[in-house]
Amino acid sequence: EPYVTYPVKSATVYDLDQVRTMESGPVWYETESLGVGSLQISNGCPCFCSFCAESWERKPYRERSLSMLAKGLRSAKAQQGLDTVSLFSFNFNTHTDLYPMILSFYREIANVSLKSQRFDLLSTDRFLVEVQQVIGKTTVSCGMEGISERLRRSLHKNLNEEQIYKACEFLFERGIRELKIFLICTGLEQSEDFGEFGNFVKRLGDLKCMADSNVRIIFSLTPLYYPPHTPLQFHECLTALEDKKKIGREVERICKFHDMEFRESASYEEIWLTQLLAMGDRRLTPALIRSSLTDGFVYYNTVPKQILRNWRTYFMELGLSEGNYLRAKGKDDIFPWDDIDLGISKKFLWEEYGRSIHFTEREYCLGR
C-alpha cells in the first residue's frame, strides 16, 4: 500500500514487565489441560543457533522480573484455577532469577512444569539438577542437535561432548527417569560424524551403567528446517531436496546397537511441504488454494505421499520449479520477507551463514 513505509519494523516490547502475562482466559473442560496454565518468563534467546527461528526473530533476549512473575502466577492461579504452571520460555535455564523463581513458585502451586533446557548450562550447574529433583521433575529434554562437534559448529550450537557428558552425569546421579535428546539431520553427515556419534552413544551407555541408573534414554531425530530470517535462509535446503532416510537409518542403527531408543519426529513429505511454504512467495497461492479447497487436504499428523505428488503437478502446471525455491541463495538475492525488519541485518545473517558453512561459531552472551 502507498501509505505503508517499507521495510515494516516488528513491534518489539523491550520491557516485559510492561505487558500482562496470560493470567486469565477460558477454562476449558478438557481432562489433560484442566488446571494447567503457562507463564511467560522470558522472550527470545541469547544464543545464535543458525537453525532456530526464535533465536533470530525475537531478539533481543528479555526477561520478566521475579516480582512481576510472582504477581502473575497468583493472579493466574486465582482466575484459572491452576494447580500446574508451565514456565513458558525457549530455554528456561537462561533466566537470571531461575532458582528463586522455581522455589517460590513451588511454594505457591502444586506443580511447576519445566520444558527443554540447554546441555551447556546444565553441565556447569549441578544444583540445577537438584532443584529439579526437589520439584519432582524426573523427565528431562535437551537439544544435542548435530551428531558430531563438527555439525554442531555448523548449527552454531556452542556445545561440546564433554559438556553433554557432564550434564548427563549430574542427571544420572540424581536418578532421573527419562532423558530425551533431540538430534537434527543436516544432510551433511559423513562417516567420521557417524563414528563420533557411535563413540558418544557407547560412552553414554557406559556412564549410565557406572551410575547404576535405570534412566530411559530416547534420541529423537528431526530433518533440518531452514527458516526465514536466519542464517540458514541462504543455505541449500538439503533435507527437502532429497529424502535423507539413509542418515536416519544409520543413526537409528547406532542407537539401537547400544540399547538406546530412537524416534523420527517428521517425515520427508512434512519437511518438503513445510520448507516449500516457508521459502515460497505469492506465486504459490493458487497451489495452496487448490490443495486446501479443491483437493480438500487438511494437515493432521502426517502429509500423505499423494499430497507431495499433487503439489509437484501444481508446480508443473504453474510453470514453477521447486528447485528454484530450495536452492542455495546469494547475499544479494531478494527474499519474499525482506520487507519485514526484525532488527537483525541481512548482512549479519550472511556473515553467520559463512560461519555455518565453514563449521565455525562465535560465543553467545547472556548479558550478565
Tell where the protein language model's regions lie, with residue ranges.
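Acidic, low-complexity intrinsically disordered segments
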Residues: 1-67, 290, 299-305, 310-339, ...
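Terminal amphipathic helices with adjacent charged low-complexity linkers/tails
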Residues: 3-11, 61-65, 100-103, 109, ...
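Glycine- and acidic
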Residues: 34-36, 50-59, 82-88, 147-154, ...
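Flexible glycine/acidic-rich beta-alpha junction loops that bind and position SAM and/or redox cofactors
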Residues: 47, 96, 149-155, 184-192, ...
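Alpha-helix N-cap and loop-to-helix initiation/capping positions
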Residues: 61-68, 155-163, 192-196, 236-243
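Conserved SAM/AdoMet-binding glycine-rich loop
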Residues: 73-218, 222-226
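Long, polar/charge-rich, low-hydrophobicity segments
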Residues: 198, 202, 206-210, 233-245, ...
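C-terminal low-complexity, glycine/proline- and small-hydrophobic-enriched intrinsically disordered tails
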Residues: 208, 242-356, 363-367
